[in-house]
Amino acid sequence: MKTPITEAIACADSQGRFLSNGELQSINGRYQRATASLEAAKSLNNNAQRLITGAAQAVYTKFPFVTQMPGPTYASRAIGKAKCARDIGYYLRMTTYCLVVGATGPMDEYLVAGLEEINRSFELSPSWYIEALEYIKNTHGLSGQAANEANTYLDYAINILS
């Protein structure tokens, strides 16, 4: 998985050289943000169920037809609601992984690849997940640098879906 740190090391190593001052400064910047990123990841983990439940409810409120349409991709039955919560949880989990590594690698490798095809195959609307992620972003309860770090990856996921 690519991160700014592993990319800098791979670049320097492929050229048979030590890390440059610029690369070291970039790596240092990541370490300075790491505490806030880990704080955000821990908070999102600890509040995951509340955030997922609230995000699913936000989707049902904004798109009430998803609770009225029959079929496995809609939330008219408990199994559909469980799938919706599972999918929202997947986006939230990828966000915490990105926070831990300090880069979008987890989303790029595990989420983005095939996302459009999955949504099309299962008739899933990206707008549902955008609403869910906006809800999480607006209610995660983080502040300061921890909020900035979390919002960076939530915004990244929202932009992927847009």
UniProtKB/Swiss-Prot annotation:
This protein's encoding gene: cpcA
Quaternary assembly: Heterodimer of an alpha and a beta subunit, which further assembles into trimers and the trimers into hexamers. The basic functional unit of phycobiliproteins is a ring-shaped hexamer formed from two back-to-back trimers contacting via the alpha chain subunits. The trimers are composed of alpha/beta subunit heterodimers arranged around a three-fold axis of symmetry. The phycoerythrins also contain a gamma subunit which is located in the center of the hexamer.
InterPro entries linked: Globin-like_sf, Phycobilisome_asu/bsu, Phycobilisome_asu/bsu_sf, Phycocyanin_a
GO BP terms in the entry: photosynthesis
Physiological role: Light-harvesting photosynthetic bile pigment-protein from the phycobiliprotein complex (phycobilisome, PBS). Phycocyanin is the major phycobiliprotein in the PBS rod.
Organism field: Aglaothamnion neglectum (Red alga)
Binding site for (2R,3E)-phycocyanobilin: C84
Family designation: Belongs to the phycobiliprotein family.
Pfam families: Phycobilisome
Keywords recorded for this protein, A-Z: Antenna complex, Bile pigment, Chloroplast, Chromophore, Electron transport, Membrane, Photosynthesis, Phycobilisome, Plastid, Thylakoid, Transport
The protein, known as: C-phycocyanin alpha subunit
Membrane topology, record value: Peripheral membrane protein
GO CC terms, sorted: chloroplast thylakoid membrane; phycobilisome
Principal cellular location given in the protein's record: plastid
Localization of this protein: Plastid, Chloroplast thylakoid membrane
Modifications after synthesis and translation: Contains one covalently linked phycocyanobilin chromophore.
